[in-house]
């Protein structure tokens, strides 16, 4: 019985570690078309510099749309056609932070933006 309880406790600890990963977005707002915004995503609970990072978005009443990805070291970046030339993804591994600079904003860019690992 004692052995079984130990395993349950170990599983609970491991699940707790997984739940400590946090990605907190900030910087959103309401702006007029043609203006700019910069989003930030503060990461914690994992080795940020070891992971490629993505931005995705969800427009009202629609599904998730991938926006951009940046490699773990910032060496490569890729964008959805809908934002290419207007949005720039970047990262600061010393600050564990991901960014999305959004220029020339359009009405169709209205969405909830999420960062993802």
UniProtKB/Swiss-Prot annotation:
Highest taxon in the source lineage? Eukaryota
Q: Name one GO biological process term.
A: immunoglobulin mediated immune response
Molecular function terms from GO: antigen binding
Region annotated Framework-3, chain positions: 78-115
| Keywords on record | Adaptive immunity, Cell membrane, Disulfide bond, Immunity, Immunoglobulin, Immunoglobulin domain, Membrane, Pyrrolidone carboxylic acid, Secreted, Signal
Gene3D superfamilies in alphabetical order: Immunoglobulins
Region annotated Complementarity-determining-3 sits at 116-117
For the region Complementarity-determining-2, give the residue spans: 70-77
Give positions of region: Framework-1.
20-44
Region annotation Complementarity-determining-1: where it falls in the sequence: 45-52
SUPFAM superfamilies in UniProt? Immunoglobulin
Q: List the record's Gene Ontology CC terms alphabetically.
A: extracellular region; immunoglobulin complex; plasma membrane
Which residue pairs form cystines in this protein? 41-115
Q: Give start-end of the signal peptide.
A: 1-19
Instruction: Give the Ig-like domain ranges.
Output: 20-117
Spell out the subunit comment: Immunoglobulins are composed of two identical heavy chains and two identical light chains; disulfide-linked.
* The protein, known as: Immunoglobulin heavy variable 3-33
Q: Which gene encodes it?
A: IGHV3-33
């Amino acid at each position: 019985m004692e052995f079984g309880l130990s395993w349950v406790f170990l599983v609970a600890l491991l699940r707790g570690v997984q739940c400590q990963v946090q990605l907190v977005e900030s910087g959103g707002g309401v702006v007029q078309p043609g203006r700019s915004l910069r989003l930030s995503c503060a990461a914690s609970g994992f080795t940020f510099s070891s992971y490629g990072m993505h931005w995705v978005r969800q427009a009202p009443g629609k599904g998730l749309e991938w926006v951009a990805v940046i490699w773990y070291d910032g060496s490569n970046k890729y964008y959805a056609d809908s934002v290419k030339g207007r949005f720039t993804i970047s990262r600061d591994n010393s600050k564990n932070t991901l960014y999305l600079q959004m220029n020339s904003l359009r009405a169709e860019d209205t969405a909830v933006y999420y960062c993802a690992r």
